[in-house]
């Protein structure tokens, strides 16, 4: 059954590019990282590493790629974005607040009376398209959205973690998306190469490794694969634009990131800071690094 959308007469902006270029994105990324670190320190800790690795991906998507309108967060013709790695919600909140989806203070994050819960809630936070956090489910939901929106115009973007890609549901969904030829579905994998409990050792490698041959695996499931550096703004923009080219199959961007990017303390100990707190001295040093 094809869904018919009512034309509201309003236009969804093509993107929110202010013309500042890569230097402008770098400046905003630093400010977003300060927001993330300050918010997590205020509540006594949280997912520093994965939030800092994914924020550049979200920044380029929202500022240079997504067709969305913060003034009309439920516009039927908007692009959809699902942060499947919902434990990095603080990064999404920081980005949405900067886009003016809401003005609730980030300091309320994960507190009892705040709408900014530890994982995104689509019923409470403007701009959140799916309540995520149970790893492995986001792509399945994205497929449903892409099927409903096929031929209408909007694109569906799903942000996965590379650790999350060990969930079997991801690959069941990947197989279905390819079979349905969903070229309005785009996956971005935050390949920061670390997860909370480490990677399961493979028979060929004595040391823990991520899902081996990630690009080959996605190709084997029928996806178009793009690989890029996850903190190179021009490279990310090029990859996201390439993903929009109709090919009759879904596209995945494997973005090579650094867990804790921008904060040397976290980058040096990514396992510790998957979900952790920092003391006052460490926090002061982090804020100095991000000054």
Label every model-predicted segment.
Residues 127, 131-246:
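Thiamine diphosphate
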Residues 79-81, 154-158, 185, 249-257:
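Generic beta-sheet signal
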Residues 1-32:
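N-terminal hydrophobic or amphipathic helices/low-complexity stretches enriched
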Residues 90, 165-166, 194-195, 259-263:
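Short, active-site-adjacent cap segments at secondary-structure transitions
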Residues 47, 87, 118-120, 137, ...:
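Histidine-centered active-site/metal-ligand motif
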Residues 36-39, 51-179:
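Cofactor-binding active-site loop characterized by glycine-rich and histidine/acidic residues
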Residues 2-5, 233, 239-291:
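Glycine/aspartate-rich loop-and-adjacent alpha/beta segment that forms the canonical ThDP
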Residues 29-45, 190:
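N-terminal capping segment at the start of a domain
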């Amino acid at each position: 059954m094809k869904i018919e959308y009512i034309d509201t007469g309003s236009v969804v902006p093509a993107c929110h590019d202010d013309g500042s270029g890569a230097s402008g994105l770098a400046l905003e990324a630093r400010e977003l990282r300060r927001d993330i670190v300050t918010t997590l320190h205020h509540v006594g800790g949280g997912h520093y590493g994965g939030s800092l690795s994914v924020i550049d991906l979200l920044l380029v998507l929202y500022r240079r790629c997504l067709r969305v309108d913060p003034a009309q967060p439920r516009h039927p013709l908007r692009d959809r974005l699902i942060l499947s790695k919902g434990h990095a919600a603080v990064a999404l909140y920081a980005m949405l607040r900067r886009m003016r989806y809401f003005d609730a203070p980030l300091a309320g994050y994960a507190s009892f009376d705040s709408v900014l819960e530890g994982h995104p809630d689509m019923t409470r936070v403007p701009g959140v398209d799916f309540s995520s956090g149970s790893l492995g489910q986001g792509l399945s939901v994205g497929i449903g959205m892409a099927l409903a929106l096929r031929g209408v115009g909007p694109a569906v973007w799903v942000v996965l973690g590379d650790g999350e890609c060990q969930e079997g549901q991801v690959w069941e969904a990947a197989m279905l998306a390819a079979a349905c030829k969903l070229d309005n579905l785009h996956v971005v994998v935050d390949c920061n190469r670390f997860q909370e409990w480490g990677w399961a050792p493979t028979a060929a490698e004595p040391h823990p490794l991520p899902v081996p041959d990630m690009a080959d695996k996605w190709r084997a499931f029928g996806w178009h694969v793009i690989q890029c550096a996850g903190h190179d703004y021009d490279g990310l923009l090029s990859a996201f634009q390439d993903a929009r080219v109709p090919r009759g199959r879904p596209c995945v961007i494997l973005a090579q990131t650094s867990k804790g990017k921008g904060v040397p303390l976290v980058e040096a100990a990514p396992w510790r800071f998957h979900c952790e707190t920092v003391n006052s001295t460490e926090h002061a040093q982090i804020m100095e690094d991000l000054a």
